[in-house]
Design a protein with these regions (language model features):
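N-terminal amphipathic/basic-hydrophobic helices that include classical n-h-c signal peptides
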Residues: 1-11
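Metallo-beta-lactamase
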Residues: 15, 61-63, 120-174, 180-244, 248-252
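Conserved beta-strand hairpin/beta-sheet module of binuclear metal-dependent hydrolase folds
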Residues: 16-75, 185-197, 201
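Residue-level marker for buried hydrophobic side chains located in beta-strands
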Residues: 55-57, 86, 110, 192-194, ...
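Active-site metal-binding motif and surrounding structural segment of the metallo-beta-lactamase
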Residues: 66-112
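Active-site/pore-lining binding-face segments in mid-to-C-terminal subdomains
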Residues: 226, 231-290
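C-terminal regulatory/interaction regions
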Residues: 270-334
Length: 334
């Protein structure tokens, strides 16, 4: 079940030059549009522009479409000059707005991992599963109207696939660990990598004196610690100076962040193993354990925010990570 959502609010400061409200320019024709997914600077939609042609990397929810259109217009890119809508994976905070945006971009093709293609062509299963958890009204409030993408406009991007944006080569690499339908994209011109959720969560409001952090997301239902370790190492082996995370934006000092991710993935897996046989108490123990990992990271990173604020920022991530550990333990037992 490919579901992910975040429902809390906070205020954050910009990690880059804010050229338009909620749009952050990183150079190399790369920028981030804040989708304002129930809070500022929590979920990014990345734009890649080359010679007046554009690719949109992840879409946010349907509510974010006007923000993307406004950002493109401000950069002088007409809707018919958008060549690609690129999905790192099909969790709804990354792909829920795909159908809406494709309706605005008459010449665009949508790219997606082969395992995710059927879910953008017919999002009924995704939608039904989300409604079953949140209810119809809350699903509509958070995600808006989820539209299908016509099959003839969908390109599957398996391991090693390449596309060109006005001659600028994009390389797609299979990146399981967070989800089996996940890709990361290397931009040949900048040498940078678009990581989706594979390089974790990194919220700018918690940056300490400009020092970034990264915390893994193990949300259900396809967390695979061994695969995630491998995907992180593979991204670093490409030698990027920067990685772009959907949650949120440009990350540097990558070796340090990767070491933190590896350490925390191990800690999550150990937490799961410790409570594997806890029965009805397992969900509560996992949730408490993830909370403890977050608070330990607060001490390690020397975040100035009080414990209550840090737990508020990570509230749904704690819940999702605990759910993902449960799914992982259940799947390992089959």
């Amino acid at each position: 079940m490919f579901i992910e959502g975040r429902f809390y609010n906070a205020r954050m400061k910009s990690p880059a030059v804010e050229s338009l409200t909620g749009v952050f320019d990183y150079g190399h024709g790369i920028s981030a549009v804040d989708s304002v997914y129930d809070r500022e600077m929590q979920t990014a939609i990345h734009l890649l522009i080359e010679e007046g042609r554009a690719a949109v990397i992840d879409t946010g929810t349907s509510h974010a479409a006007p923000r993307v259109l406004a950002a493109l217009a401000a950069k002088g890119v007409a809707p018919e000059r958008v060549d690609y809508v690129i999905l790192t994976h099909v969790h709804l905070d990354h792909a829920g707005g795909a159908g809406q945006l494709m309706a605005h971009f008459p010449n665009a093709r949508l790219t997606v991992h082969p395992r995710g293609a059927r879910h953008v062509i017919d999002p009924g299963r995704l939608l039904a599963a989300t409604v079953a958890i949140y209810g119809e009204a809350e699903t509509r409030r958070v995600y808006g109207k989820i539209l299908p993408v016509p099959a003839h406009r969908v390109i599957e991007t398996p391991e090693g696939a390449t596309l060109r944006l006005a001659g600028r080569e994009l390389l797609f690499l299979d990146a399981p660990g967070h989800a089996r339908h996940h890709v990361v994209i290397r931009d040949a011109k900048s040498g940078h990598v678009f990581a989706g959720d594979t390089f974790g969560l990194s919220y700018r409001e918690l940056d300490q004196d400009g020092r970034q952090f990264s915390f893994p997301t193990t949300s259900p239902s396809q967390f695979d610690p061994a695969a995630l370790h491998h995907s992180i190492d593979r991204m670093l082996s490409l030698g990027p100076e920067a990685i772009y995370a959907t949650h949120f934006g440009r990350l540097t000092n990558l070796a340090v962040l990767a070491a933190d991710l590896h350490r925390l993935i191990i800690a999550h897996a150990e937490l799961g193993e410790r409570h594997r046989g806890a029965g009805a108490r397992r969900k509560r123990l996992l949730t408490e354990g993830v909370s403890e990992l977050v608070l330990a990271e607060r001490e390690r990173q020397k975040w100035r925010f009080p414990r209550e604020k840090v737990l508020e920022v990570f509230a749904l991530d704690i819940e999702l990570n605990a759910q993902g550990l449960e799914s992982w333990l259940d799947s390992e037992g089959k």
